[in-house]
Amino acid sequence: MRILVTGGAGFIGSALVRYLVSINAEVLNVDKLTYAGNLASLKPVEGLRNYRFLRADICDRVAINEAFETFQPDYVIHLAAESHVDRSITGADDFVQTNVNGTFTMLETARQYWSNLSQNRKAFFKMLHVSTDEVYGSLGDRGQFEEVSPYDPSSPYSASKAASDHFATAWQRTYGLPVVISNCSNNYGPFHFPEKLIPLMILNALDRKPLPVYGTGSNIRDWLYVDDHARALWLIVREGRPGEKYNVGGRNELRNIDVVNRICLLLDELSPNASHYGDLITFVKDRPGHDARYAIDATKLETELGWKAQENFDTGIRKTVEWYLENGWWWQPLRDKVYSGERLGLLEKA
């Protein structure tokens, strides 16, 4: 089984690659290695016979075509994307280039590759386009996003992902390319680049820096442990029906302030300090266009394909905090040289 994974040096991608290699799939990881791509996240699979790495930009059609022709994948799982909302506010160009144009390149290259396969291999081939619940916009106090929910993106990031979803759907409907789409809720877990909420709070707390909470901290997100997501992606690309969408969520809805408080309480327990970590919480100016609530209904994935999350938020966040406490070798170079925790996405100074 040969699987081409794009963005496999990123957070979700590296979790998927580690999982696929562990079940003896043959994996080609194609990654540009932007600031958020980190080969250190793949040390557990480095040098193994069933893992290969290709540094390439998904917008480079020549490189991507060569990857398809040389590796001859049975499945493609497309995760490569710019994903941080704050960065999209002040740097939308990169998001359009990678998330829209890059997805177009992947779809068109996959279509040409698939059309030239033998009938048996053609019937077996499938591509999974991995997306986000943010394409649906903001929910009120009730309800959950379903696969049929209308698209209503609020940020340049979510707009770029919505566009890429529409391209994937169009390539399936127009050309018959066997594409499946997944839309996930907020992921968390080990090897998470420290610009995102949970790793940023953990590492700022350990450095005794302020813990910046946007607005009042009342925005609600559904949290999905990254290894549960990796298992879901493998299941969807194998068993999902072309032309269908599958929402992937953890059924863990929490306000941002409650997430930060849980992290602080865990750090008080696992790495006690003279003062409580919660004293570092600081409320800051809200993000422009900050969606109030996301909630995923994963019933379709659970009932049709039999997926079930193994971690709830209590078990997953404990594993995550423990991992960061034990793995400074991974995150300290990032804090020192790549991103030290400064505020991103401000249109004007706070």
Curated annotation (Swiss-Prot):
* Protein name, entry field: Probable dTDP-glucose 4,6-dehydratase
Per the UniProt record, the source organism is Sinorhizobium fredii (strain NBRC 101917 / NGR234)
Which BP terms does GO give this entry?
Answer: dTDP-rhamnose biosynthetic process
Catalytic machinery residues: D133 (proton donor), E134 (proton acceptor), Y157 (proton acceptor)
List of residues binding NAD(+): G7, G8, A9, G10, F11, I12, G13
Pathway given in the UniProt record: Carbohydrate biosynthesis; dTDP-L-rhamnose biosynthesis
Which residues span the membrane?
none
* PANTHER family (UniProt xref): DTDP-D-GLUCOSE 4,6-DEHYDRATASE-RELATED
Query: Mind telling me which NCBIfam families this protein's record contains?
Result: dTDP_gluc_dehyt
As cofactor, the record names:
NAD(+)
- Enzyme Commission number(s): 4.2.1.46
Alphabetized, the UniProt keywords read:
Lyase, NAD, Plasmid
What family name appears in the similarity comment?
Answer: Belongs to the NAD(P)-dependent epimerase/dehydratase family. dTDP-glucose dehydratase subfamily.
Q: One GO MF term, please?
A: dTDP-glucose 4,6-dehydratase activity
Catalytic reaction list = dTDP-alpha-D-glucose = dTDP-4-dehydro-6-deoxy-alpha-D-glucose + H2O
